């Protein structure tokens, strides 16, 4: 019997060939060419204090007399450790300076924060607030006329975060963009583009109005509070740093963000015909005031809500076992960059001083001031590590960062040049010979000299006596390296039985 289900089926020719992907350069993990020793050191900073005005800086004769110290700003610490290659070790077997170099490996960190918990208030005396859009009582459609700015204050979005790496952290924000040769009419909305930049000390965090360049995109200077109205709010570019090839900018991070919208307002300003509400989305009204539509430019005031010590990321120790990137905590060039954002201690100090000898109260008799203070303390546990000076390791490190080899006083051989060169006599003073050559610019030894960081020098604050410091004692206990001073063994007491004949017998 013929099986109809086994008939031959014709298929068209498949002329598609799938080739294997192109090989990529393999990025090595630091565990593959860095050897760790059993030597650990503790490093701690002094008490780091900061005092200033919470909303803006105050200048006199074009000189800043009182800096801006906002609780909503990033603090970026550039921590420098001592060069371990200059240490004098008693044990000569620790490393061979002819074939090895020493580096630090981060094992523990604690970021201490002083001052009580508090909510910082920010605002603007002329904030663009047209009307209440949450519970309106009147239909306001005069958004294109007059001046409706009000004195408004609120608390910002609550943020706790810190980020650790051996290179500066990257941030992202939105700003205006213009194509070459494009004509932009006055009043038109510009193009916007994302900008990636280094997060510097003093850069503003996102407080609930987005990561953007407010100086370029909000020319009315009244849409956001004073501390960000002419600033750029940046947000850490976690995606970019997570995909970084060498993993130097972000060993690990911790963050906690929370926000809700407290009030809903409308903005003043002309919406324009280009972005008017399409008539297909509503039915027209027959009578005023609804024949003219109100503005659709809505905004909500952020609020970070309650702060609590139960959800604090700071004042606790963190132990580094495995980083998310290829750099497993190696502090290249003996430095770390600690990016901190924390506005849970944002209380502003209100200071009032008498300006005359009057003994009665009047607003005119006192001068009021605002100050904000911040307190930090940084502690680290670092491990001594070795790198063998093999050609493969040196070539790989030179590709990653040539400055590392320069710090190690190693140079890469240059290709041979022409041994015969021209040397003119009186070249600098003679008008007959050719023009003297320009002196080559001095090589830049610090690639981050154009950025602003809080410098923390720990070159003389390192110790191998871990038990003398709080973080060191925690590390000894967590790692099981604590030396026990007393044995826990106990001696069993002998039981004695006294018979009626007063003879002592040892219990069997």
UniProtKB/Swiss-Prot annotation:
Superkingdom in the source lineage: Viruses
Cellular compartments per GO CC: host cell nucleus; T=7 icosahedral viral capsid
Subunit structure: Self-assembles into homopentamers. The capsid has an icosahedral symmetry and consists of 72 capsomers, with each capsomer being a pentamer of L1. Interacts with the minor capsid protein L2; this interaction is necessary for viral genome encapsidation. Interacts with protein E2; this interaction enhances E2-dependent replication and transcription activation.
GO molecular function: structural molecule activity
SUPFAM superfamilies referenced in this protein's UniProt entry, alphabetically: Group I dsDNA viruses
Role according to the record: Forms an icosahedral capsid with a T=7 symmetry and a 50 nm diameter. The capsid is composed of 72 pentamers linked to each other by disulfide bonds and associated with L2 proteins. Binds to heparan sulfate proteoglycans on cell surface of basal layer keratinocytes to provide initial virion attachment. This binding mediates a conformational change in the virus capsid that facilitates efficient infection. The virion enters the host cell via endocytosis. During virus trafficking, L1 protein dissociates from the viral DNA and the genomic DNA is released to the host nucleus.
Skewed-composition ranges (Basic residues): 491-508
Stored Pfam families: Late_protein_L1
Keyword Disulfide bond tagged: yes
UniProt-annotated stretches for the region Disordered: 480-508
Protein name (record): Major capsid protein L1
Localisation per UniProt entry: Virion; Host nucleus
Family according to the record: Belongs to the papillomaviridae L1 protein family.
Keywords: Capsid protein, Disulfide bond, Host nucleus, Host-virus interaction, Late protein, T=7 icosahedral capsid protein, Viral attachment to host cell, Viral penetration into host cytoplasm, Virion, Virus endocytosis by host, Virus entry into host cell
Gene Ontology BP annotations: endocytosis involved in viral entry into host cell; virion attachment to host cell
Lipoprotein keyword on record: no
Gene3D superfamilies noted in UniProt: Major capsid L1 (late) superfamily, Papillomavirus
